[in-house]
Amino acid sequence: MMTDFKKMDILSLIKDSFFYGLSKLIPGLFGLISVIFFFRWVGAEEYGQYSIIFSFTNLIAAFSFGWLNQSILRYGSSFSSENKIVYPLIIGSVYGVSFIISILAIGSYFYFPTKFPLTTTILLAGSISVFNQIKTRFQSNESPKNVVLITSLQSFLMFAFAFFTTRWMGANAVSLLLGLAFGYLIPSIFCIKRIHLGQIWTDKNKLMVKKFFNYGAPLSLWFGIQLSLNFSDRFFIEQFYGPQLMGSFAGFSEFIIRVFSIIIFPVTLAIHPKVMNQWNRNQNTHETFRHILNGGLLQIVIFSGVLVLALVFKHHIFNAILSLVPGIDMEMETLLIPLLIGGFLWQFGLIVHKPLEVAEKTKKMVLCILGALAINIIGNYFFLPKYGLIVTAYTMIASGTFYILSTVMFSPSFWGRIHSK
């Protein structure tokens, strides 16, 4: 029988998830609208080109700046003044930008993953990186209103600038990418404060950057590999079936992902501070597990309702999506249910891996996500040409299942301490 205390925990989680959902509503809706209109403006083939270039650029930005963002969340509150953390961040940002320019220049030279405009992609990657760093600093300072404000503004400006650039430069992938770059850059410029700069390249600041890197690099690697899963799907589909079909897949899958970000992801956002704060207070595995269990159960309940509706009204749902995003290949209807299941498994995995995350077992998290990426690559490379796009959807399910099971297996001490309570 559930105690009143546990009921209060679940009610608190539902309440927090609801408010996180509201905070995600405006960016989520603009993201959903962007998928619809971007696809309409440029068509399936150009949208496919845009999608794979953006996925690659976002991936490089995550590898270049993710370690800094994770360090801000971990160490930001330990600095007595803003200037003291700014100096190491400036040094780290110089390294990050240098890495972005180098990797994108190499990719552009070898036409990997496809031919793309180097200057535009450098601007986009840099803008994404700066924007995410500013957003992370707001999160570290516990300023949720500023996070909502800047993400909402970014979502609106991204859409608005993309509208103008496609009218000015023509309806193509490059104009969309340039519009997105300005959408990330403009709100970042307004948020940058004027500070008094002293000696930046001191030994103390360099040591702090080294500390940031040692802590954040494994997490940055994890985020980068996670983004590689989406990039891998698009890369192999384009290689075997061309940009037209890849564009249809990208538009359809991103539509579903945007819906998930509004419905399911708020639970993940709500559970994260509860788990971290509980662990930081007393490292009580039993109480931490209760929060993880509540979050997982709430996600399962929400997804079960979504899945039942999708199974009953599958054809009607696909027709509704088709009316919003015309030009999507009819084959996408067979992917609806597998993509929903795969999307849920990865959201569920973000909660299941919390024991490793709170215990700072980031190397084990990286091993798990590498295994999932290997399944993705092997499945797409060997079976996609023979069986079609349904393989990509099923590799998403297989990789998500592997990640969940492997993270559980890597947490025996945590689960053992739970059962010993």
How does the language model describe each region?
Residues 1-30, 205-222, 407-421:
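N-terminal membrane topogenesis motif
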Residues 44, 108-121, 312-344, 390:
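Interfacial segments at transmembrane-helix termini and the short loops linking adjacent helices
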Residues 9-68, 159, 217-244, 254, ...:
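Signature of the first transmembrane helix
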Residues 54-62, 226, 249-269, 273, ...:
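Transmembrane helix-bundle signature of multi-pass secondary active exporters and lipid flippases
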Residues 92-221, 345-351, 370-371:
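Hydrophobic transmembrane helix module of multi-pass membrane transport proteins
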Residues 15-27, 53, 58-116, 281-307:
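Membrane-water interface segments that mark the loop-to-transmembrane alpha-helix transition
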Residues 64-80, 252, 256-283, 355-358:
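Helix-loop junctions and terminal segments of transmembrane helices
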Residues 16-27, 84, 88, 122-128, ...:
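Alpha-helical transmembrane segments of multi-pass membrane transporters/permeases
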